[in-house]
Regions:
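RNA-contacting regions in translation and RNA-metabolism proteins
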Residues: 1-181
C-alpha cells in the first residue's frame, strides 16, 4: 500500500511569476509589481510588470544585465519564450505592448463588454495574431479583454456599414429621405 502522493506541475500559470519573484530582487522587495501573466507552457509566455518606484524600468529590471535574469527563468522553464510587457493605466497602451512586435494603429475599447478592436496594417496582421493565434491568445489572457484584430481596411468597412445602418434606422424612424438622414 502506498502513502500520500504529491503531484508537482511546472505548467501552473503562477509558476513563472514565482520564478520572477525569486530572480528579480526588485519584485521580491515590492518595487516592481507583477500585474498579470499568461502562459502556453513549454512554448511561450507573457508577463505584465509595473514599477511602483517610477525611477525604475520594470522591463529592464526583469531582463537584467545582458538578459541574465530573464534567461534564468527561461532556463528553468526549459526554453519557454517570455515577453515582458510594461503595464500602463491605459489599456490601449498595454494591448499595444502585449501584441509586440506588431505595430498597432488604433484600439477601440468597449468597456461594458470587456472587448477591444485592435486595428493594424495588413503587414502587421500575422505578427499580431502569432503562430496558430498564440500571440493574440496570450495577450487576451494577459489583459483580460477579448481582443478582435482587424486591418485598417476591415475597420473602415465596418464603420461604413455601421453608418449605413444608422442612417437607414434614422430614415425609417423619422420618415425622412436619405439627404436629411
Amino acid at each position: 500500500q502506498r502513502g500520500q502522493q504529491i503531484f508537482l506541475s511546472r505548467a501552473h500559470p503562477k509558476f513563472m511569476e514565482k520564478l520572477f519573484i525569486q530572480e528579480v530582487p526588485e519584485i521580491y522587495d515590492g518595487l516592481i509589481e507583477i500585474k498579470s501573466s499568461a502562459r502556453d507552457p513549454g512554448s511561450r509566455a507573457k508577463i505584465c510588470v509595473k514599477a511602483i518606484d517610477t525611477s525604475l524600468d520594470p522591463v529592464g529590471a526583469c531582463v537584467g544585465m545582458r538578459g541574465s535574469r530573464v534567461q534564468a527563468v527561461v532556463n528553468e522553464l526549459q526554453g519557454e519564450k517570455i515577453d515582458i510587457v510594461n503595464w500602463s493605466e491605459d489599456i490601449s497602451v498595454v494591448v499595444s505592448n502585449a501584441l509586440s512586435p506588431a505595430e498597432v494603429l488604433k484600439v477601440n475599447i468597449y468597456e461594458d463588454s470587456k472587448k477591444l478592436d485592435v486595428i493594424l496594417t495588413e503587414e502587421n496582421l500575422s505578427k499580431a495574431i502569432g503562430r496558430r493565434g498564440q500571440n493574440v491568445r496570450l495577450a487576451t489572457k494577459l489583459i483580460d479583454y477579448e481582443i478582435n484584430i482587424m486591418t485598417d481596411k476591415e475597420e473602415s468597412e465596418k464603420r461604413q456599414e455601421e453608418f449605413k445602418d444608422r442612417t437607414e434606422n434614422l430614415m425609417k424612424n423619422l420618415e425622412v429621405d436619405e439627404t436629411l438622414g
